């Protein structure tokens, strides 16, 4: 059975610098979407950056980067859960745990998302999206369990509807 689910997320990060007689404040808002599509998790995100400069002149520069996407195979994910974070900012977080340290390499980095640990992708959720986060984690866990069951039975993964033999119902 092919699983599908989608979950939006929003990240914020900022950086302030004082150099000589100039103050620079940069604020980035990252709007993203996690999408479970069969045996892959797609992570899409767009960075909107606002840079305020105060010095000889006062100005604000705004920039929106193009959408980036990373595809993570389910075979590199060990699990998913929604946790409550009590530290600032408190709220629900979706945590994807990697089965391979290379799982989140495409997502992390200077142009990507910041990871506190290379084996965990923790994404803050809006409080209104907590139930949606639990549903996404459940769908992902179900897809992982079905993969493990198929591997234990020695069966190939269930055919997806777009493969030619998936809908073959010949009784002859």
PLM regions: where:
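Anionic N-terminal interaction surfaces
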Residues: 1-58, 63-66
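Acidic, Ser/Thr- and proline-rich intrinsically disordered linker/docking segments
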Residues: 2-6, 29-31, 60-172
């Amino acid at each position: 059975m092919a699983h599908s689910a989608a979950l939006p997320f929003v990240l914020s990060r900022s950086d302030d610098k004082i150099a000589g007689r100039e103050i620079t404040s940069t604020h980035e808002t990252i709007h993203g979407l996690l999408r479970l599509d069969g045996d892959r998790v797609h992570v899409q995100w767009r960075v909107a950056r606002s840079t305020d400069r105060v010095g000889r002149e006062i100005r604000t520069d705004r920039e929106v980067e193009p959408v980036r996407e990373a595809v993570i195979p389910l075979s590199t994910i060990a699990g998913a859960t929604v946790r409550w974070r009590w530290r600032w900012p408190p709220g629900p977080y979706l945590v994807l745990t990697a089965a391979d340290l290379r799982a989140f390499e495409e997502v992390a980095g200077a142009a990507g998302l910041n990871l506190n640990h290379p084996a965990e992708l923790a994404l803050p959720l809006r409080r209104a999206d907590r139930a949606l986060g639990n549903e996404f984690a459940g769908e992902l866990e179900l897809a992982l369990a079905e993969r493990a069951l198929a591997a234990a039975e020695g069966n190939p993964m269930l055919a997806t509807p777009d493969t030619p033999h998936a809908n073959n119902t010949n009784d002859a």
